[in-house]
Amino acid sequence: MHWQYAVFAESGFSQEAAAYTNPGMQANLVLRVFFGILAALCCLVPMKLLWRNGELAAAIFCLDVIILNIFYTVNALIWQDENVGNWWPGYGWCDLQVYLDYALDTLYSACVFEIMRNLAAKVALSRVTGLTSGEKRRQTLISALVLFPIPLFQVAFTWFILSQRYSVAPLIGCLSIYDSSWPYLVFYVLPAPLYTIAGVIAAGKPLLAASIRPNEKNRT
């Protein structure tokens, strides 16, 4: 591919690259926009229903997917070819995305973990009745404490981790450029996979419990 990333700084942006596009990029653009809009629309109704039922993690998961797909779709429409000279520099729009980039990815994984944890807790209930209003409020509070602290910290700490303002690429749009340091590794790279691993463990607990119970009954 004979294209290059256009790196934007405070002083302005480069206009050296010539306009360029090809059928592959056009197909990529169409698919990105179509599936991005479709995915966002498909999440609207579930998000409303889950929010009404007090399922905070699942509702935030849907909202996270909607926001990410809006970013992907709008970015593809704005920077749909390699005509760097005519590109919009992305001031404001890319600044917003840079601060939300890792936070949204981490929130996505945190939601998956919290959904699995809540499902495991509900499967483990031995009573027939549902949760009381007090238990639901407590569950919502715990979910909020699981979901939001790390993403909010990432948003607040982003300015200290960036090595430059941002860069822009065709179809992808805004890109974050981070400094290669241990805070970046610990507070930005590791949280999402750790949440994912914890989600797998939480999902496996009911299966493990179900496999242990028959063995205990057989022993008695």
Model-derived segments and spans:
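Membrane-proximal first intracellular loop
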Residues: 1-144
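C-terminal membrane-anchoring module of eukaryotic surface/secreted proteins
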Residues: 34, 50-53, 152, 180, ...
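Generic alpha-helical transmembrane segments of integral inner-membrane proteins
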Residues: 37, 41, 70, 149-156, ...
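Transmembrane alpha-helical core residues of multi-pass small-molecule transporters
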Residues: 64-67, 150, 191
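Fourth transmembrane helix
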Residues: 133-169, 196
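Extracellular-loop-to-transmembrane junctions of the mid-late helices
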Residues: 154, 158-161, 169-209
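Intracellular effector-coupling site of seven-transmembrane GPCRs
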Residues: 214-220
